[in-house]
Each structure stands twice: as C-alpha cells, then as structure tokens.
Amino acid sequence: MRSKFIVGLAVAACMALALQLEVSAQQGRGRGAAAGGTTAGAGRGYPTPEQYANSKEAQAHVAKARAIAGNDPKLIMRWENTCGALGPQRPALEAQNAGKAVAPNTPVEPVQIFDNMWYFGLNTIGAWAIRTSDGIILIDALNTVQEAETLIEPALRKVGLNPADVKYVIVGHGHFDHFGGAPYFQDKYKARIAMSGPDWDLVERPNPNANPAQANRPRPKRDVVVTEGQKITVGDTTITLHITPGHTVGSLAYLIPVRYQGKPLTVLMLSGANITPDRASLEAFHKALDYAKAAGAQALLNGHPGLFGDESGWMDELRKNPKGRNDFVYTREQFAKFVDIMKECAASRVVAMGL
C-alpha cells in the first residue's frame, strides 16, 4: 500500500508541475481569471492600494477590526492577514504580486485535522474528507481525474478510509482546481456531486480563456444543485451550505460538524467567500459569518492552505505531533471576534471602491 502511495505521489508531482505552468498562465491574466470560467468581479473586485489608503471610511473599518483583535496575538495575526486592499491572499498569488518566484505545486502527505476530518492533495490546493457513520463526504476534488486517482484515492486508503464509501463530493465553486477530480468519483463510485446552480452553469459553459488541456478535461455531470441554506446529510453528519457570491456567483460557505478530541466542534469552510466585489456579495458573506457565529464555530478552513495563516505549517505540526497543539482551533470567544474582524475587513474593501 505504501509503495502504491509513493508511486502515486511521484506521478502526481509530474502532473502538478505541468499544472503549475497552467495556473501561472491563468494568474497572469489577472487575479480574477478562473480555471473553470469567469470569476465574478474579475478585474474590479478590489480597490487599488491608493483607494484603500485614502478612504477614511475604509480605514475606520480597519481600525475597528484592529480594536476587536485587542491584545490576542492570534487575532492580531488574523487581522494583519485579512485587512488590506486585496484581503487574504493565497501564497502563490502573494508571491506573484510581489514579483517573486512562485513555489511549485507539490503533493503532500495526508493529515488528520480533526477526529473525523482529513486533508489530502497538494501544498496549494486540497480535498477534505469527512468520515460519517454511513460513508464519506469529500469537499472538493483537486484539479484533474488523474489527481483524484493518484492522490485522493490512495490517500483515503492510507488513512484507513475506503474510496468506495464516498457518498458525496461537494464542490465549493466551479473552478477546475476544485471540481477537476469530481468525475472520477462520480463515474467509478457513483458519488453524488453537489454544487450551486450558478456554478454548475459555470462548469458547463465553454471558457474562451481555457487552453486546450483545460478545454478537454472531463467535467462532472450535473447532479445535486445546492440552494441557499441546503443541508446534506450522510449518516450522523449534516453539513449546512450557504451561497456566497463573490469569487464566483455560486461560491459556497459550509458549516461542518466534526469531532475534536472526542468532543463536537463546528467548522466554517469558505470557498471564495472572502472575495466581495459588491454590496450583495458583502451581505451574503456577512450572513454566512453570522450563521457561523450563531453555531458556535471554532475553526476556519478553505481549499487553499495559506489563505488565512500559516496553514501548511499548522498541518506539518499535526503530522509530527497529531495530539499536539492544533492552530486551526479557536475558543468560541476568539472565533466570534475573528468573524467580526473578517466582516469589518471585507466591508473596508467594498467602501473603498465607493460601493
């Protein structure tokens, strides 16, 4: 089993290098450029640094967010990461915007974040597996069917899960790096594929910016159409989904019940919801955050490690010491403050654009 996993990593590393070239080309067309289609707000979703710095109203939101963080080092880091003209950025985009070399995509060892939740995939994009009493829910599925076969499938087996038990793949938004591997589980294991209606449309719509390799990739067949507030239940686990337009028209936010050290804990997962190019997307984002606060959430996850902190480093620590400190976890009071920080920082960008 280990030898198969190592072979899979080697194959995936080669594919990841090719995909890195593809992603760099996409990013070169602007931060709004999308693998699966056109991103909502592409090229207009953020204020310029000058707009941001010169807007008194925006800076008032920034100051309020800083006050909420108080003297808590963890919250101060989240404020520094979240407030700014571009908001939280993936490390690859941050490096690119700074004119630095972008680190290549590389496969990583699976890591258990909570008692019943794991991360698989690459250092820059991943899939999440949630074990329930009656099967597995996957969140996202990497870039391609090949990555699903050579990375996700062997990783599931490595942590003691059976890929045949995957009941759902819930896709956070309709870009290739999230839905690319979904057809593999749909075709081989008959897993249900869930995505918002607007993003099913995005997946099915021809993308004029796609290169030939992208254009010819398999796409999942339309299946479960997620609506606002929809719940998906497998066994003892019910995930609640909220539609948060911004990165795409139908980007999702998830409320996921997990267990941590034997106790229940609620996770908020954002799939692009931190991008709010207009008032409507800001209001939807705020509502999703309010739902998370009301649910007593204590952790924030997303598909791209590094978006909200040194998440790759936190994962490395959990690989070394699975029972050690878990930096993904907040107290309820901390997380409620983090929610308010995110709300103020998102509002600061919208008002800086004069919206």
Show where each model-derived region lies.
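Positively charged n-region of N-terminal signal peptides that target proteins for export
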Residues: 1-5
